[in-house]
């Protein structure tokens, strides 16, 4: 979900994804509505969807240039060895969000990612947070990008990227 909300285009939750339905949708049966009240199963996913919607609304970088090439830049799209993608989203105002997604079942420690600017980047989303039912692998809320060029960008940061998770970093200066 963290990847879909940060990537260009609009989001689509289909038939129970927001409650963690494990069965494929079928026109022959209804949704598993009991998952809504199952804190252990669906509670974390519901909290994540609420946070994703709030972050999306509050970060113009994620929506203001959805149909413009100037609103998106790949950081890394070819790291098949680590099963990761990283990209940037931009708003005309200067608002910038970096999204790093790990599709592997293992965390990546010290994973270097290029960023356009040095300074403080706040970790505004970590889908592996314990509040969503994850393991809590993260970056303690913020990272400091240093003047180490990486991925063709002027700065970079070393991250803890959670397993099967997404991390969003928002530039704060």
Regions inferred by a protein language model and the residue ranges of each:
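Carbohydrate-interacting/catalytic domains
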Residues: 3-13, 17-173
């Amino acid at each position: 979900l963290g990847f879909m909300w940060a990537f260009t285009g609009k989001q689509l939750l289909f038939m129970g994804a927001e409650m963690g339905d494990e069965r494929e949708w079928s026109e022959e049966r209804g949704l598993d509505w009991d998952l809504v009240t199952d804190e252990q199963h669906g509670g974390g996913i519901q909290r994540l969807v609420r946070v994703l919607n709030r972050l999306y609304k509050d970060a113009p970088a994620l929506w203001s240039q959805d149909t413009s090439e100037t609103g998106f830049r790949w950081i890394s799209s070819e790291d098949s060895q680590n099963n990761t993608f990283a990209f940037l989203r931009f708003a005309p105002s200067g608002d910038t969000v970096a999204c790093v997604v790990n599709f592997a079942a293992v965390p990546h420690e010290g994973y270097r990612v290029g960023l356009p600017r040095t300074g403080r980047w706040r970790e505004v989303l970590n889908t592996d947070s314990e509040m969503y039912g994850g393991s809590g692998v993260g970056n303690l809320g913020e990272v400091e990008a240093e003047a180490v060029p990486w991925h063709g960008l002027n700065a970079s940061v070393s991250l803890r990227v959670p397993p099967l998770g997404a991390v969003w970093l928002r530039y704060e200066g």
